[in-house]
Amino acid sequence: MSKNSFSSMANSVTSFFQSLTTPNRHADPSFRPSRREKQSRLPTPLQSVAASAYSGVNASQTGLLNDSRANSVTNLPNSSNTSQVGLNNISPAPVGYVPGSKTNELANNSMEMQEISPNGSASLPPPVSESWRRIDRWAEENYYELYCQLCYGATVADVDSLEYELECTLPRDVRESLYIHDGQDRGGQPTGILFGVTLLDIEEIEEESELWRRVAQSYAEATLAGKIDQAVASRQASFPPGAVQCVYAHPGWIPLAKDFVGNNIAIDLAPGPAGQWGQVILFGRDQDTKYVVARSWADFLAIVAYDMENGKWLVDEDDNSLRLIYGPPREQWSYLDILKYRARKAERRKFKKRDGKRTTRPIPKSIAKEDVTNSANSTAPSTGTTVLDDGLDNNYEDIPLYGPSKDEELIKKEELEADTDLGLINTSEINQPANLPDEPTAETSNPVSATTVEAVTTTADNKDEEKNDHVTEDVSQNSTIAEASSLQAQEEEKEIETTSVKQE
């Protein structure tokens, strides 16, 4: 027996006995969150691009290649209450992440409140447990095989070990989600609980994150060496602009679900200047534009629960995959495409609310879209920067991203394929009143053919003849009545005269 075979057998036996003695699904019973053996590769905690050493494609330094940090107190801003001598006497002490700190934070009830929303509106998402309760209930009633694929929840040690391997701090809602369902078993089918997108367990999250971190490492090295394909680099974008770092892959993107064709639903632990820590994004092989599809993982689960309860779903007969019915008839959009469309629609609603104007008639697509910057700096009398009507009434304006998402009208396919579809248009010519002439002229009026004139004239003559016939009949009837009345009067006069003669 070879050494590798013996080692594999020993690991299997050890795993079997561990499964009998510990509730952990992934972590070893001997795992201690306080131990720290790996060399950190990322600034800790992962921050936005404004505070991170990783600055994208044109970076001169990157956290992937240079692990320099600025965590010592000597780099703090100068303050009037702090003496420079005191700072020099303090030795630099880098602040590192200790796995399990999130667990201790939860136990001490010192967790910070999650941010309400990017625009400051008081619209908190439902609790993660409530969203999963709705998803479980729907799956058990409508697709029991898919419900059985959902795994049991992970333990605290499992989640702590995941943070240890990834060297990051996971958002609270992600931890809570893993405590409820630690991914799903595929069962040999490409069926995902997220409308065809499979939920990953802790082990798969580690493997997928490691894979994409190697891709990000290669991408960063090629960028610094000047060997990156400029066509690929120029296609990397963010929606909304500035919310996600415009790179192909980033070590701060933690995949939580994937479609097994190279695309992922992930949480962003290193957002752009306009982004939010813990936001849910799409990235991968077909996602050059990185879309923000939810403010947090709790928001995203609420969206999924709503879509399931909405009733517009079907099970594909070929691969038994769950699909959401959305878009034109006879076309099946992937759930990732639907999420991207909704992100654009939410951005349009934001522009509508900001400008306070909307169009009430369909706009030809041939009209050029108006640039946001130019419209904001324009000094011309503005009819306003208006947006395409998306079929939603005014009651939907203040609904958060996880609210009602039904769109009763058909979605145009060409709108989905647009690169940056904010619905912005140039209405300077459309909204101006038309210059109508006072009187119709021969040039503007439509010419009438001779045949038409003759037909109209003949019809009019026929009507006049019929009218004259009716008048003649009426006159003759009146004459007959008058003659009868005259004869009757004459006879009465004769009778009166005869009576008077007899009396005399």
UniProtKB/Swiss-Prot annotation:
Residues 68-91, 373-386, 425-434 have a biased composition (Polar residues). Residues 25-40, 461-473 have a biased composition (Basic and acidic residues). SUPFAM superfamilies: SMI1/KNR4-like (SSF160631). It holds the Pfam family SMI1_KNR4. The modification Phosphoserine is found at residue 500. One of its GO terms (cellular component) is nucleus. Residues 448-460 have a biased composition (Low complexity). This is Cell wall biosynthesis/cell cycle regulator smi1. It comes from Schizosaccharomyces pombe (strain 972 / ATCC 24843). The lineage of its organism: Eukaryota, Fungi, Dikarya, Ascomycota, Taphrinomycotina.
